[in-house]
Amino acid sequence: MTLLKQFMIVSLMFSGVITIFSTELKSQNLPKWNDEYHKNWWMNHGSVSEFTQSVELLNKQINERLNKDGIVKLSQVPSFFELVANTFCAKYFVVPYLNKHQGSDNASFKQIQKFISNNFNVPGYLTRCSHYKDNKIEVIKILLDLKNKDPKIFADYVKLAIAVSLVWDVEFPDSWPHQNVNNADLPILNPHFSQPYDFIVQSHLNGNLFYDPRRMTIRELCFVVDTPVSTKEKLYAQQIKIKRVNDLEGLYKMIPYDQNRINSNLYTWPYGEYSLIKIGAKNGGICMDQSYFVCQTAKAKGIPSILFMGQGRSGVHAWLGAFDIGSGWDFTVGKWESEKYPVGYALDPQTWSQITNSEMEYYLGSSGDSPSSLRGKVLLALALLNKDSTNFVKLIRYSSSVMPRSIEPWDIEYEWLTNNNADLKSIGRFWSRWIKNFKEESGLKARGQIALLQIFKKLEMKKNYESLSKQIISENKSKRFDLGISIDYEEIKNLQDKLKWREAEDKFIFALNNYGKEKSGGHLFYNLVQPYVHKLYLHKKNDQIEKARSLSRKYIVTNKGTILDNDFIKLFDQIE
């Protein structure tokens, strides 16, 4: 069977779609996008309104060809992906920027025309590396400002500039860098997007970085520029001596562990300014502070890094992921394997949404910045260009089939379903497809299962609910036991809400027996024991509280002087 015939069969099988996935190639001229055409198209408009009309015309041409030839054939047309990337960049980045910022100012329009016409890679980079939640107007503003500072430097470090624009397009969240420091104590002085850009450029020119930022991917660079701390802090971190990325773990040992804070229940930094020199040379810190110190040191040296926090046998712990350009990401720097952490949580620097270490491994392990993923991002852009057409759902699903480990097209489709008031059964089918697609990543799969569980509950499908609930607990008893514990507590809470105290207690005891005491300490306490006991306290169930205390002590082994031990004692002492 020829490759062409294989494509034809796949296109017809996919979602039963024939209309836009037809393989009959019709003659419908599209611009042959190359460097010369790129320059002429971006410059060949006399006004913002003329440019906007031209963008819509280009999008219309693409859609006409799409409807006649189908996406499989169309995506084989030379330069098609660059054509879509430029159309997407123009429609979703440039036009909104011009409409909001001095749209009637001819000089501003000419400036942006010149900017993109002379920087051929910018539309492609933005289309392939942006996220649908990015503040696209602010992205263009940042890029223009960085280009105007020094056009030559910008041309050399364009990927760095793109990374800065995608991270700094919105304010850093209040939860940065972690919850154990007050924002007022952070060493941040008038944060501005030019600061990380200038620092990395100058550090590279001075030979102070591990890697050449011009050779790194935009996604990797996002994990370098995602810090608003002052240049003074970065310079301090930069002078710390390490020879290899593997040496980062050794930095934990140079920071004294502040056991007095644990003993005094002072988990939030109590020493004023949260500076690296205070952590490293004066006050020391607990695991969150140690990991923050090492993470900032890595970034100052141009090493992509991310801080994770998770629950283990002894309670909460912090560690980090660090990127070695030769061997890739290591998500276990400073992690205590004996603690059996099922998962670590962090902030994705591009969206500031929560991400787990297992999700990052899952995505980067197969696709990441691979050609298929980048191709899928352009197909996703094509879907967004058709958001108001009947082709949208078919295109969004096609893009997700090309990059099956990406969550983004699924999030977009779910938003579309809810915005269009889809019924519960339609949303249930969506989550069923999600579960099948993400079956290899337990956290993502469980997200779909839990969502489907709630739909079964709303539809009063009791047998389906009970069956799926048992399945989630069974599948996540070992590696992602935190998910199973959460499902168990949800059932216990439902019984408590109905004042079925004896049944709730039986389920509580079953959960303790089910997970045992080998590895689940922190999650078992914070996700099961603590909320269970709080509910009992509200209803003055003192006998059951005392029974919960004695049972929990059998199953949760705490080490004296740990956060978990403190919180365990504190829970029952407060109730007494």
Label each PLM-derived region with a short phrase.
Residues 1-11:
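Bacterial N-terminal signal peptides that target proteins for export
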Residues 64, 83, 90-281:
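Secondary-structure boundary elements
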Residues 332-410, 415-425, 437-442:
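Low-complexity, Gly/Ser/Thr/Pro-rich intrinsically disordered linker/tail segments
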